[in-house]
Every structure is written in C-alpha cells, then in structure tokens.
Amino acid sequence: MRLSLTSIRGDLAGGLVTAVASLAFALTFGLVALAPLGPERAELGIRAGLVAAIVGNLVASALSGTALPVSGPRASITLVQGAFVAGLVADPALDVNATLVLSAVCVGIAGAFQMLLGALRLGTFVKFVPYPVIAGFMCGIALLIAFAQVPHVLGVASHAMRGTGLDWLGAVRPWTAVVSLATAAIVVLAARRWPRLPAALVGLLGGTALYFALRLLVADGAFGPTIGMLPGGLPLPTALADAPAVIASSAAARHLPSLVASAAVIAIIGALDSLLGAAAIDSVTATRHRANRELVAQGLGNLASALFGGVAIALSPAQGIAGWRAGGRTPITSYVSSLALLVLMLGGARALAELPLAVLAGIMLVV
C-alpha cells in the first residue's frame, strides 16, 4: 500500500490501539513464562513479556509475510516455556541467572528451528500437525500453570506451600482470592459480552480497579503483593552473553535434552499458531499471507527476543485485527505499537510496579 498522510494517520491510531490490546497479553504471558521463579521475581517475567512485545514484534513485523503483522507472547508457547523453566527452578544447582540464560537459549533455538522450517519451505506442512495432539499437550501444561497460580490467588508465598503440612493455611488472604476470582470472572464476561474488546485488558483494568477500591476499605495486610519495580533501562542484547559458560556447566548439561525438546515444541506450536493467525488476518484484510516468509520472520523475531531477554513470540491476530479496525494498514502500525510499549516500560515503570499479582493470576486462570 502506498503511504499517504491519511494512511500514516491510520497507522498511528492503529498502532496505539494495538499497543493497548497487546499490553495485557505481554504482562500476563511474560509472567506465565517465568512464573516458576516465584512471585518475588514477578517483575522479571513482566519485563520479559514487554521486551518480547517490543523487540520481537519489531523484528518479526519488519520481515513478515502478513498484511498487518503484530507479534507478541502467546498462551500456547509461553505455557511450554513456563514448563521448561519450572524444570530448571526445581534443580537447586541452577541459580536465577543460569535459569534466565537457559530460558533465553531455548527461545533462541526455537527461533532458529522456525527459520529452518521457513527456509526449507515447510510452512504448508506445519498445518498438518494433528490438532488433538496439540490440544492434549497444551491442556496438560495449562493445568500445571493454573496450579502454579494458587499461591498468587491465595496470597501465600509459594515456598510456604512446598512442605507436606498445612501450616500455610493460616497465611491465606481471602481478599486476595476475591480479587483474583473477580478478575477471572470479568475476563470471561468481557469475552462473551464484548468480543471485540481485548478481554484480558478489560480484566486487567477491572481487577486493578477492584483491588485498589477494596484497599480503601480493608487493611493493606489483607492483600497479596504487587509486581514491584521493573529492572530499569533500555533493553540491551546481552541476555545470551553468559550462555557459553552456563551451557558448559555440569548443572546445565543435564537439562540440554529438555532444552532442545522444549525449543522444538515452541517452534512447531508457534509456527502453527502464527500461520493460523495469518489466515485469520487474511480473512479480515482480504489479502493472502506468505507462509514460509512468515516462519522466517517469526524465527528472527524469537531470536531477537532471546537476545534481549524476552519470552517466545508468535503472530497475534487479535491485536493485528484490532489495529486494522482502528485504521492501521501497513507494518508501521506494528512499529508504533512497539514504540508505545517501550515508552510505557521506560516512563510508566512506577505505575506498572503497582499492578497486583492477584489480578494477573486471575487473568492467567482463564486466558
């Protein structure tokens, strides 16, 4: 499409709408991917989700084979990444830095696999992966992630629930559970009543408003924590700097088979998710995507996300369609979205720090 003042205005409006629609997914799925690190490190997951929606989206959109490409963290692939991270966290020989490095390596290898699929022109064949196999696999992982939200929902420290006794019951915060369950209900209601609105964002806003309203009436100690301040500064491509040393360690060596297997699963599910999403965008934009180019673009986007410490990404049709309906017609829409999220991450860190974990846990229960 030829650029004009009208199209640029539409892309600017579409980009801002896309950024708003992407925000809740970036926060929630970033937290899903790194949730096994525990609530005390929730800010790492939040930042990783935002970095993916900024850097990964920027790179993938620049090379995409879809009319209006918007990429970011997706439930399907972040669930797989979260399961891999859970295995790393369970190993006492690995510290937090090693876990983050191996998680980034997993995303990077997944990106390389996707680039290979595209280069070999296997995009068409990815669609033939049996859906029941993927559905069963994802349901199993989703249950694990849902159980992992129990500490956030109840307002109890995750380490307190790892013992065999029930002493942690005395630490349960009922009001935290009220906020989480109310948030989940808002997401479900929004998805049914207002299908054109991003249900996760509606839940984020509604749940956060409820949280702070209740805090005016109930003592602060009755609620669980907020996510805390995000690590400051611009995202830099240093997440894999320690990868050679970490991978060479004996502690990491035993996780390499799981790392490669998880990367392959992320690559295949992400490829399938992206191609199905591209078809959905085609139906709205009356265009036709290029499957193999899209796989290469998503692979490069995942590699870029890994370099900057982000989580895995895939094409996000809901955000792309929202941008189209707001006037976006070119990839500039995606670039504006990434820029808007970057400004929010750098300038709105204090506001993001006040987001309640109970609200994000409620979103994860249903999304």
Labelled PLM ranges:
Residues 1-367:
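Transmembrane helical cores of multi-pass ion-transport proteins
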